[in-house]
Amino acid sequence: MKRILVDSCVWLACFDKTDSNHCCADKILKVLNLHDIIVPYPTLYETINTRFAKYIYGQMNGLFGFINNPSKVHLVDDTAYRERARSIIFSNINKGKPYSLVDMIIRLMMEDVSLGPFAVLTFNVGDFVGVNSTEIINPREI
């Protein structure tokens, strides 16, 4: 059984029927049901603060039903990564490295050996390639 960190875009694809990647939802959910899930709080902030929360109230129940399973889903506090992520984002703002704050926090988590090994499930593979030896899984390829 793997541990898989799920990026915001994957939650949107699974539970927002209007998302361009929703066609992958069934495959994604089958995979997630087989593994332990790591959910960094920033991905919840990003997911819930999008069109998802504003327009798709009923589908949020699917997300919360999935996430509220403490035997499979592990919420990770981002406090330890916030300041460094902010600092990196602002120092790289004019260097052509445009990562979002959420993506930077995920990248820092990927570097944190204390979290143990995990894979990252994301449609935005390019945002995470090259961080340690973390496996990056593109949902279109599962």
Regions found by a protein language model. Name each.
Residues S8, T43, T122:
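Ser/Thr-centric signal marking residues that sit
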